[in-house]
């Protein structure tokens, strides 16, 4: 009997839940990216949803770009999100790193023009084994371009240029002057802090 009551209580609890529609941030088009159930709108707040750039743009070539959005506001049945981070799928990264190539990684903590603090992880794959001095030169190029972009762009524009490959393309353009490249990528972004809003 106790087991039946537990099952019945679980069913009743599920019946009380409502579905909330989750929307991407405005600068990603504000499109619907998922549904989530909850018996209280407060429980929807801070939930994180993972989607791919393909889900948002319809571009099948962007399925390896994972985006993370966090719910910050609920109005009625609608849940609105903010960008929390991105990363490339591990399988995609593995496909780039082959024998006799060199992977150069850079991790940079930046502050955007409008005060958002981000950790940006960039990656360059050289077509062959390269010298340590060449690695250092390429890493310096990565740093200079990412820092310059942070100074010039607000949070939304920086994220879009990173996610859409524009920053990586600029890194590749300069880094290939040091050594022929296979690929340059922004492989991960994490939001570390947001600007304080004046009371």
Swiss-Prot record:
Keywords of this entry: Ribonucleoprotein, Ribosomal protein
Molecular-function GO terms, alphabetical: structural constituent of ribosome
A GO cellular-component term linked to this record: ribonucleoprotein complex
Biological-process GO terms, alphabetical: translation
UniProt-listed Pfam families: Ribosomal_S3Ae
Presence of keyword Ligase: no
NCBIfam families cross-referenced by the UniProt entry: PRK04057.1
Protein family according to the UniProt entry: Belongs to the eukaryotic ribosomal protein eS1 family.
Protein name: Small ribosomal subunit protein eS1
Organism: Pyrococcus abyssi (strain GE5 / Orsay)
High-level lineage: Archaea, Methanobacteriati, Methanobacteriota, Thermococci, Thermococcales
């Amino acid at each position: 009997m106790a087991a039946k009551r537990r099952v019945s209580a679980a069913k009743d609890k599920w019946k009380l839940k409502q579905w909330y529609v989750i929307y991407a941030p405005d600068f990603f088009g504000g499109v619907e990216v998922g549904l989530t159930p909850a018996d209280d709108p407060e429980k929807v707040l801070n939930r994180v949803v993972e989607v791919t750039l393909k889900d948002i743009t319809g571009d099948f070539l962007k399925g390896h770009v994972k985006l993370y959005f966090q719910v910050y506001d609920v109005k009625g049945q609608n849940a609105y999100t903010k960008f929390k981070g991105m990363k490339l799928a591990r399988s995609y990264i593995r496909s780039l790193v082959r024998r006799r190539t060199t992977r150069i990684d850079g991790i940079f903590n930046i502050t955007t023009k409008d005060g958002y603090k981000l950790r940006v992880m960039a990656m360059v794959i050289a077509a062959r084994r390269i010298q340590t001095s060449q690695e250092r030169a390429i890493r310096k190029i990565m740093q200079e371009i990412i820092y310059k972009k942070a100074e010039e762009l607000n949070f939304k524009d920086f994220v879009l240029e990173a996610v859409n490959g524009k920053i990586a393309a600029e890194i590749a353009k300069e880094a290939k002057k040091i050594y022929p490249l296979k690929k340059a990528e922004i492989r991960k972004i994490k939001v570390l802090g947001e600007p304080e809003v004046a009371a």
